[in-house]
Amino acid sequence: MYLNLYKIDIPKKIKRLYFYNPDMEPKLFARNLSRVNNFKFQDSNDLVWIEIPDIDFQITPKNVFQYKVEKEEIIKEEEDKKLFVKTLYKYIKKLFLDNDFYFKKGNNFISNSEVFSLDSNENVNAHLTYKIKIHNISNEYYLSILPKFTFLSKEPALESAIKSGYLYNIKSGKSFPYISGLDGILKIDIGNNQIVEVAYPENYLFNFTTRDAEKYGFSKEVHEIYKNKVFEGFKKIPKTLGFLNKITNLNENYQLKDGYKIFINVIYKFKNGESRYAKDVFKYSFYKNEQPLKAIFFFSSKKQFFEVQKSLKELFHNKHSVFYRAAAELGFSKVEFLRDSKTKSSAFLYNPEEFTVKNTEFINQIEDNVMAIVLLDKYIGNIDPLVRNFPDNLILQPILKEKLEDIKPFIIKSYVYKMGNFIPECKPFILKKMEDKEKNLYIGIDLSHDTYARKTNLCIAAVDNTGDILYIGKHKNLELNEKMNLDILEKEYIKAFEKYIEKFNVSPENVFILRDGRFIEDIEIIKNFISYNDTKYTLVEVNKNTNINSYDDLKEWIIKLDENTYIYYPKTFLNQKGVEVKILENNTDYTIEEIIEQIYLLTRVAHSTPYTNYKLPYPLHIANKVALTDYEWKLYIPY
């Protein structure tokens, strides 16, 4: 089996060389040397120095060595691990820049030769890109090399026929918000409300996102490129990146030890049977249901109502339709469309500009668990106003008008499933392997940052072993900080803990704390308050963007890297991507592998539809969604 890991085979030490040029300012001397060597030189009041790997490193120009001083230092890796890794990254960057690659933030290297124009939009070029990361696995260093694609404008910004929100500087590797490009003057936002004119506009290309791809009609081709060409990117590594053989051997693949590839057999328990597949819920029925499915329709105008009337009748009033069959298969006792007692109509109007309803007297009397089927005239980029302004006693289920004409059966079935997800008395399934884990509390923590506004949002979400959401807490617009505010975290943790007690009438025996990213806080403080009442705990770091992957199909497999670090590959419709999990602390009676199994199962304790899986463990998925949006998350998270 292939993994994109290559052992770094160089001495584990760094050389520091010093230079003194009496005829030039150290800052200017360092800047010139950095430019010609594609490697950063540092300076002080009198000296210039460079930290390099202990290998054959060619510094140019040759006459620079007349300024070299005798002082030379060797720093071993065990003396300064951070310096060793940092220097390796700098050297790898130099190798790429020396070989006609662009650098992009995040150790992405964009090929200037492996590039082609898109068939669906000739103004866009697809550049083969390699993302690089250094890993320490069992005290050995490895390089992961992940092929991907970057979509840039074919022409420089001022000449490009299409535009996007961001510009990429091919020299600095940085991206900036695009402001304008009038009269041959390119303006960008460099942050802190500073808008500047660009001195060298020829160095700026538009960088296109997935949203841009939808806007300009090349999203389908992007998907095809990732589906068909990433494999080629892996195969090209030994030849295209041969210059990396200075630090590794690209012809030697990482060897996975016996027993380090793990498969978890996930079994869903439904009312009338068991299956490995969530979609079999339509075969075996909801684990718990027998509720009526109540709904009410909202239209933007009478004109819209008459335009979709035929489609709606076929879908929602035909007792033999997919909608009715799906409701019966999931165990709903009946389907009921609420009608105004005065007008006898189940059709209501809303204001499409403000998203407010027009018959508030009747609407306000409606009890909980009623679906609001809202017909939208067009795609809404920001759906927050709809969620914010609609009555809280309704469960929003919006549908695009244009989708009604040829809505596919599996989408209708997913729609009915989603409705059931939002009814507290319904339970689609339970996982067989999680059935006996009711004494565990699972908590996800996410920090999202707005560097432009210099604000941070903190979110915590807690679920039980069946995926029931016990608590969600969010703190918005905190001062920008990579570290969590531990006072806030402690208060939120106590609330989640109390919600567990409220449901089960007993304290949890084990608490799983899953952090999106690394714990850079003082974990002794965290351990102190989560061990309240002698609760056992585990602290888990989750990296949702691991660089380790393969051209082999690893979906539904777990890879063990070392005793505390694993990668699982969820089965999704999208391209194969792994999630790296590191057990930082284990104070429970579970083994590390048993903890990893539960973390993986948390990706399956709930489904937004029975045809898709979550990439992240459910409490972390919730925290991630809630932290990033103000209201939109309420459309997807049943809380």
From Swiss-Prot:
Name of the molecule in the record: Protein argonaute
GO cellular component, one term: cytoplasm
One Gene Ontology term of the molecular function aspect: DNA binding
Organism: Marinitoga piezophila (strain DSM 14283 / JCM 11233 / KA3)
Region of interest (Linker L1), ranges: 101-153
SUPFAM superfamilies: Ribonuclease H-like (SSF53098)
SMART domains reported for this sequence: Piwi
Binding site for Mn(2+) 2: 446, 624
Effect after changing residue 482 to A: No cleavage of tDNA
Described function: An RNA-guided ssDNA endonuclease that may play a role in defense against invading mobile genetic elements. Uses short 5'-OH-ssRNA sequences as guides (gRNA) to bind complementary target DNA (tDNA) or target RNA resulting in target cleavage. The cleavage site is 10 nucleotides (nt) downstream of the target residue base-paired with the 5'-end of the gRNA. Reaction rates are fastest on 5'-OH-gRNA:tDNA followed by 5'-OH-gRNA:target RNA. gRNA between 17-21 nt supports equivalent rates of cleavage, has no preferred 5'-nt.
Residues annotated as the enzyme's active site: 446, 482, 516, 624
Segments for region (Mid domain): 293-424
EC number: 3.1.24.-
Binding site for Mn(2+) 1: 446, 516
Keywords noted in UniProt: Cytoplasm, DNA-binding, Endonuclease, Hydrolase, Manganese, Metal-binding, Nuclease, RNA-binding
Subcellular localization: Cytoplasm
Disulphide bridges: none
Region (Linker L2): 210-292
Cofactors required: Mn(2+)
Domain notes: Has 4 domains (N-terminal, PAZ, Mid and PIWI). The N-terminal and PAZ domains are joined by linker L1, the PAZ and Mid domains are joined by linker L2. The domains assemble in 2 lobes; the PAZ lobe consists of the N-terminal, L1, PAZ and L2 domains, while the PIWI lobe has the Mid and PIWI domains. The PIWI domain assumes an RNase H fold and has the catalytic residues. Compared to orthologs, the N-terminal domain has a different secondary structure and position. The 5'-end of the gRNA is anchored between the MID and PIWI domains while the 3'-end is in the PAZ domain.
Region (PAZ domain): 154-209
Region (N-terminal domain): 1-100
Note: Unlike most prokaryotic argonautes, this is encoded in a CRISPR-cas subtype III-B locus.
Induction info: Expressed at low levels (at protein level). Probably part of a cas1-cas2-ago operon.
